Regions:
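Globin-like tetrapyrrole-binding proteins
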Residues: 2-173
Length: 173
């Protein structure tokens, strides 16, 4: 089993959390913008969603909130991520869809945050989404992701969201 490493600094985690608090008050509009953009970028994703999109938007925002809160202790989400990956697989989500979702997410954040969507914020959110998407894809492919939260002067804290070859239980999400 192969593990992929994603590094985030405490500052990047803080930026994601800080800017997400600005999204929460506009979460319904942000979710609607997200899906509108996703369907424009990748029309094949439209058929993956059945039912009420407002409810789907609420689920999206709840999932983002959970990820944002868990970025510095991602191992607490392993069970949930594995379950989500398996549901996505049953719905027909393919690996390339995660690229479209990431692009739609960054665009939505840019629209919602306006001047607060700085290059540093973009990079922080891109890394946070990388943690999520690579974890979901890795869960299905038998790979894992190691999240490194960089500390000062070379010290770091490692969170592994990967299988036994990485020394941690497999994805239980």
């Amino acid at each position: 089993m192969q593990c992929e490493t994603i590094a985030m600094t405490p500052q990047q985690i803080a930026l994601v959390r800080e800017t997400f608090t600005k999204v929460v008050p506009i979460r319904e509009q942000a979710a609607a913008l997200f899906y509108e953009r996703l369907f424009a970028i990748d029309p094949s994703t439209r058929s993956l969603f059945h039912g009420d999109m407002k409810s789907q938007g609420a689920k999206l925002m709840a999932a983002l909130a959970a990820v944002v809160q868990s970025l510095d202790c991602i191992e607490t989400m392993l069970d949930d991520l594995r379950a989500l990956a398996l549901r996505h697989d049953r719905y027909g989500v393919r690996e390339e869809h995660y690229v479209s979702v990431g692009a739609a997410l960054l665009w939505t954040l840019e629209q919602g945050l306006g001047v607060h969507f700085t290059p540093d914020v973009r990079e922080a959110w891109a890394r946070a989404y990388g943690v999520l998407s690579r974890g979901l894809v890795g869960a299905l492919a038998g790979r894992g992701v190691t999240v490194v939260v960089l500390r000062q002067a070379g010290a770091h804290h490692v969170h592994r969201a990967c299988g036994s070859a990485c020394g941690v239980r497999g994805w239980q999400v």
